[in-house]
Each structure stands twice: as C-alpha cells, then as structure tokens.
Amino acid sequence: MAAEIILINPPPLNWREKHDALNHPHLGLAYLSAYLRQNNFECQPIDAKFERMNLEELGKAIKKYRPILVGITAMTHEIGQAAQVARLVKELFPEVKTVLGGAHATALPQETLRQFPEFDMAIVGEGEITLLELVKTLIQRGELSKIAGLAFRPSSDAIILNNCRQPIQNLDSLPFPAWNLFPPSQTYSLITTRGCPFRCKFCMRVSGNQPRKRSYQNVLEEFKMDINKYGAGQILVEDESFGLDRKQAYPFLDALADSGLNKKVKWVTQTRVDLVDEEFFQKLKAAGCAWVGFGVESGNEKILKEIGKGITLKKVEESISLAKKTGLQTGSYFIIGHPYETKQTAWDTINFAAKLNTTTVAFGIMVPYPGTEIYSMALRGEGGYRIISSDWADFNKTIGASLELETLSRKELEKLQLLAYFVFYFKNWRFWDFFKLLL
C-alpha cells in the first residue's frame, strides 16, 4: 500500500495503561496527517494506543506500507515504548528514517537522540510545518540543517539542534483533523486555541506561551464535521484554558447554541476558575456543554502561590459553585507532592477536594516533567525534592514513581493519593462512585 509517511502513537506499556488508554484517536496525529495530505503526501496514522495494539500487531500493520519516514509521538513516560517502535521500524525497513515528536522531544531533543539511537531526528514544538519540510528534504536529498525546529544526527557521534521554529499564527489555515484515516470512534477531540500564557511550575507548554486562536466560524465548521461526517456522540474541547479570550469564546458558544448542534452532541471542556463567571457558565450550558473541569491543584493557599497557579481557594469555591448552579457537571484536578509539600498541606488538599464534591475528581502525584520548572528544581534538589528513578516510564502521574520529598516518602505519597479518593467519595456518601473507580 502507498504511504510515504507513517505516524504512530505507541502501544500501551502494560495492562494498566491499556485499560486507562483514551477512548478516542490522537488529535496531534490527525492534524499532522491532514496537513501532509493537504500538501499531496500520502500519510497513514496508526494509533496503537487507541486501538489497544501490542508491538507484534503494530509490526503487522506497519508492514502493509512502504514508507520513507516514520514519525512517532510520545509523552515522557512513553519514550521507552516509542524507542521500541523505532527499533521495530529499523528491523522491518533498515533504510527508513525515524523522527520523534511530542512533549519529551520538545523538552530534551538532543538528550533524547543521544539516549535513544533508534531515533534519527526529533521535532521540537509544533510539528506540521517542520514535518512537511522534513519530508520534502528527504525526497529531494536536501540539507537537514536548514529545517527550523529539527534536531538530527549527522553522524554517529554528533547531534545538531537547528534554530527554533516560530509557532503557527493563522490556525484557520490548518486543515481539519483527518479522522477518516482512523477507525471510527464515538468521541473526537478538538482545540480552539494553542498556547498558554500562564506559568504554572509543573506544566509542560509544548505549544508555547503565546495564545493563538481559531476563528469561531472555523471551530463551528469542525463541530459540524465531527457530528455530520463522523457521527460524534461526544466532543472533547481540549484547550488548556477554554474561554481565555471571551471575544472568541462567546460568539462561538452563541453560534453553537443557534445552530442546533448543541442538541446533537455532548461536549466537555476545561478552564481556569479565574476566567469564568455566571454568564460564561450560562453560555456553556446553552451551547450544550455537559461538563467542565478545573485545575485546582492544591487546597493550600501557600502551595498555590508557590507553584505559580495564580488562583485562590475562595475563587475556586465560587466558580465551581456557580458551575453547579448552572446545571453543569464539574471536574477537579489535584496534585499531591508540590514543592515543600507536607502531610498537613496534602491533607488540606484532600479535605478541600471533598468539600468541593465535584462530579469527577483526579488526584495525581507530582511528576517532574522535563521542560518544567519542577524538573529543574528536582534536579537541583530544591523544593524538598529527590528524583528517585532514571527510568522515564516512571514519569507518570498515575502509576509512576519518579520523585519523593524530604517530608514525604514515595510510599507516603502513594498512600495519600489512595486516601484522597477514599475520603472524597466516602465523605460525600458516594460509595458506588468509589467502587466504579476500582473497576
């Protein structure tokens, strides 16, 4: 089969990750595939995680094609799986080039190429234009050194990082995600903006600090496509902070309500507590939004200030109360293991989360993701941190074990995480919700 480029989301690492894997195809691969096809290159994405493939099954899928380039995306904890995929590609097609993209490659491009010789190149930041230029350069046998946003290995003992690539400004110029190249799904994701202006110490910002927005008309057309062409039953609006620009969000929400699409699909999103008010929630509700999530992170004011979150507990309570009043389901996200965290501050978080009693909740253990200020602090031993693993697979907030604090051992952090769920559900008499969590 003809496919000049194959783009891969690696298989799940283990049964737990297979169970927890997302129930919708990868948005980044869909954007990249659409962009390459718009520019007349045959591209085939393989979302091994979404399809719950193992490595052997992925190998059979890859062998159907004759690529000149294989791209692999990976978060930090997935980098080992991505390297396994790259090794598999080299076994099947020794002459084919492999390129890594995603958060880990963006944060540590040179270090990653040094650690994993299976990758020939790494893309730093947004991938559409860089990947297209890479494909053209490989076909024309041009110079890789001229491609902004690329790291590559010109020889076995050298690694070059080219100049940075500026973020795409006109997001409306990008084609809609190529969902037709993936197996059918009931759920699809989209974004209305790229980039985040906030500077939380724990967060990776692959798309940079400069917010760039799509026109509301462009987003509305994608909504229509997902529903009418692909039969979406649920849409995830995956902006880091939906509603960052009211001048964009309000016309979109009004148009969505007027279009009747709000009655055809359930959609969810996430935002910040300091970006919302009652009018905002009313427009969300009228536009068909069913659930809105908030990154609360901590139930302690000093910790919130330490991590640069820029919110207060009072504002958290006010915003979530307003969302509930409007009839929206709510979600809250918390982290245990902030800089200088103690057992008392962790319990402040647990009790505050229970008090909020959102529809859903998630408690993660802090991970020092490369590219974040937390990572730099942990490397320097600041914040009371100790990195206790050099295995990137442990850099997973749900099931990993990458760091501990002088005041809280890894076992204590894990115990607090479990207790957080127990207290949240049992204190609110939500016993069945707790047991569903264990299934």
Region spans (language model):
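Hydrophobic/aromatic residues located in beta-strands of well-ordered beta-sheets
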Residues: I5, T98, I147-A148, I235, ...
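Proline-aspartate-enriched helix->loop->beta-strand connector
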Residues: R66-V70, A232, T358
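C-terminal accessory regions of radical SAM enzymes
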Residues: A2-W15, A151, Q329, W347, ...
